[in-house]
Amino acid sequence: MEISFYDFQNLHNEEFRKEIKEIIGEIIDNNAFAEGEYNHKFEKDFAKMQGANYCALVGNGTDAIEISLEVLGIGHGDKVGIPGITFYATIEAILNRGATPVYIDINPEDGLICPESTKRMVEAHDLKAIIPVHIYGLPAPIAELEAVCNPKGVKIIEDSAQAQGTFLPSGPVGSTNNMSTFSFYPTKNLAAFGDAGAVLVPSEELYKKIKTIGNHGRGDDAMYGRNSRCDHIQAAVLYKKLEKIEEYNKSRKEVATLYHQNLEGSKVKTLPTKYLQTSSWHLYPVQCESAEVRESLANLLSEKGVSTTPFYAEALSEMTPFKGHEGEDEKAKAFAGRTLCLPISAFTTKEQIEYICNIIKSV
């Protein structure tokens, strides 16, 4: 059985292709390429879905973080805390602003940023902001982080690149008073046909500032900006896909539940069951006994036709461009070294799950 890590074929089925071709044809006929009605429609509906007041579309998820830092006035000489495990974009945005990243350790049960480590780093390094990551689609402990950061005036930007449809105890990711950044890269649960991103914000003032910066700083309040627009075709694709996202996320939760059930008694460790109904399950990670076991298992699954990937194979501090920064990340290093992600999509079948889990349980 051949099982791909991403299932684009079922996602972009014939019905969807027909509908999206009609929309793109409409955009071509109207000569509305840079921005248009679908940008505004998507911003309105995505904000509503995530419980936010405003959604500002931008060019990509990395820009979403960097512009958020800029809006908060964070730049040269400022220190920003990030979890030891995340995608390159989180730390790149900080470095692009001329700020200094400080590593914060993770909870070894789930890979999420640790509030206790956050408290230590806030006090030791005079952080101006932290960027907790809703990694894999899991909800980061935002309320606990706010209890640490708010009294000290430390800003929080939620990196929600993998969390379209994720729920905190208080509501959807994006419904807090923090800025929340999203990526719509083609592999995400809600994905464009190229690059696109967004920032969810609580106020119209922040919304307008983000949109101005992303449009070369042009507007009534002119400022230094950049080219970070989401083009009309990408916005149209996102608007169309938004119709199915809740249905598809529900299916992902069912897939994750079946994985949990079928992996009972195996040698891999699954994430806590408390996340089964709150995560968007962008990824389905398991923990192996060691990096060597992970490599062996990945090779075995590959031989049997199953595509896997080690998101993320290393902590940031172990990657050449990001070595030498201060902080703590020993648990992050251990977690990254043992993590393997199994295929998950809205279309993963029970038969595929059982096939994968039987291979895992055979070792």
Residue map of PLM features:
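PLP-dependent aminotransferase class I/II
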Residues: 14, 39-44, 49-53, 116, ...
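Conserved PLP-anchoring active-site segment centered on the Schiff-base-forming lysine
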Residues: 66-125, 129-131
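Hydrophobic/aromatic ligand-binding patch that stacks against planar heteroaromatic rings
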Residues: 92-94, 148, 189, 233
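Active-site phosphate-binding strand-loop segment of PLP-dependent enzymes
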Residues: 109-192
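Active-site PLP attachment segment
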Residues: 175-209, 232-235
